[in-house]
């Protein structure tokens, strides 16, 4: 961080930034290959229940239109 920026920050902002940096440093790091494998397995496990991939039954949808639009 730029030293001139530190002079302009107040004490509370510096404490908050230090807490944030400590939190980020304490996070467990994973290699990208492991992250991708975990994400892929999560997606494959939950794919069956995803309403965007498998549309729900239209008969049980209360918001689905019951009929066609009628022009008066």
Swiss-Prot record:
The keyword Nucleus does not apply. It is a lipid-anchor. The modification N-acetylaspartate is found at residue 2. GO terms for molecular function: G-protein beta-subunit binding; protein heterodimerization activity. GO terms for biological process: cellular response to carbon dioxide; G protein-coupled receptor signaling pathway; phospholipase C-activating G protein-coupled receptor signaling pathway; phototransduction; sensory perception of taste; visual perception. SUPFAM superfamilies: Transducin (heterotrimeric G protein), gamma chain. A lipid is attached at residue 69 (S-farnesyl cysteine). Keywords: Acetylation, Cell membrane, Cell projection, Cytoplasm, Lipoprotein, Membrane, Methylation, Prenylation, Sensory transduction, Transducer, Vision. The modification Cysteine methyl ester is found at residue 69. It is found in: Cell membrane; Cytoplasm; Cell projection, Axon; Cell projection, Rhabdomere. The keyword Transport does not apply. Its main location: membrane. Almost exclusively expressed in photoreceptor cells of the compound eye with some low level expression in the rest of the head (at protein level). GO terms for cellular component: axon; cytoplasm; heterotrimeric G-protein complex; rhabdomere. Residues 70-72 form a propeptide. G proteins are composed of 3 units, alpha, beta and gamma. Interacts with Gbeta76C/Guanine nucleotide-binding protein subunit beta-2. Belongs to the G protein gamma family. Guanine nucleotide-binding proteins (G proteins) are involved as a modulator or transducer in various transmembrane signaling systems. The beta and gamma chains are required for the GTPase activity, for replacement of GDP by GTP, and for G protein-effector interaction. This subunit functions in visual transduction in the compound eye. This is Guanine nucleotide-binding protein subunit gamma-e. It comes from Drosophila melanogaster (Fruit fly). The gene is Ggamma30A.
